[in-house]
Amino acid sequence: MANAGLQLLGFILASLGWIGSIVSTALPQWKIYSYAGDNIVTAQAIYEGLWMSCVSQSTGQIQCKVFDSLLNLNSTLQATRALMVIGILLGLIAIFVSTIGMKCMRCLEDDEVQKMWMAVIGGIIFLISGLATLVATAWYGNRIVQEFYDPLTPINARYEFGQALFTGWAAASLCLLGGVLLSCSCPRKTTSYPTPRPYPKPTPSSGKDYV
């Protein structure tokens, strides 16, 4: 029997990670302008996401420009977009599958083993979703580091990690942890031994033997 509390905890953590992946994908602060160096501009903040780039003025006014051309984007941004969207879609599938396998739900009550396997499959899908998010954020973050330390990159064109990137890392961690907890509900095989057959007891003879 699977631990219902462990299942519920894993489902909640993985679901929170899935929500975090959506928030991270939508936020425009994947990388923010770096103020390191001599060229320091404090009147505005420049940041860029997967779908747009924005400039925030000190007065509170924000101007954003959506990336219109798909072919004009670099390969890292395109791959990050694809992985994040795939991770979100997989997380949605995992939520439906895991819900069926939860012990607190009444689906598949007649088949306890199949119900537990549904929870395990949902946990595995959550693991794949978390890996997709982790690879996407790590790849994008590595690109930021490479460009920051590249001597050919101008000082006024260097960026640092943004809030959305940290949100994505936290979301991936929650999805992975929740997926592991759900996968721990895998039904264990029990060794069955053959039941010994009872031998009939000899019945005592009712009469006496005569020679």
Swiss-Prot record:
Subcellular location: Cell junction, Tight junction; Cell membrane; Basolateral cell membrane
Disulfide bonds: 54-64
Cytoplasmic face residues: 1-7, 103-115, 185-211
Membrane topology (UniProt): Multi-pass membrane protein
Subunit field text: Can form homo- and heteropolymers with other CLDN. Homopolymers interact with CLDN3, but not CLDN2, homopolymers. Directly interacts with TJP1/ZO-1, TJP2/ZO-2 and TJP3/ZO-3. Interacts with MPDZ and PATJ. Interacts with OCLN, CD81, CLDN4, CLDN6 and CLDN9.
Tissue specificity comment: Detected in epidermis and liver (at protein level). Widely expressed, with highest levels in liver and kidney.
Protein family membership: Belongs to the claudin family.
GO BP: any one term: bicellular tight junction assembly
Alphabetical keyword list: Cell junction, Cell membrane, Disulfide bond, Membrane, Tight junction, Transmembrane, Transmembrane helix
One GO CC term on file: basolateral plasma membrane
PROSITE patterns assigned: CLAUDIN
Broad class of where this protein is predominantly found: other
Protein name: Claudin-1
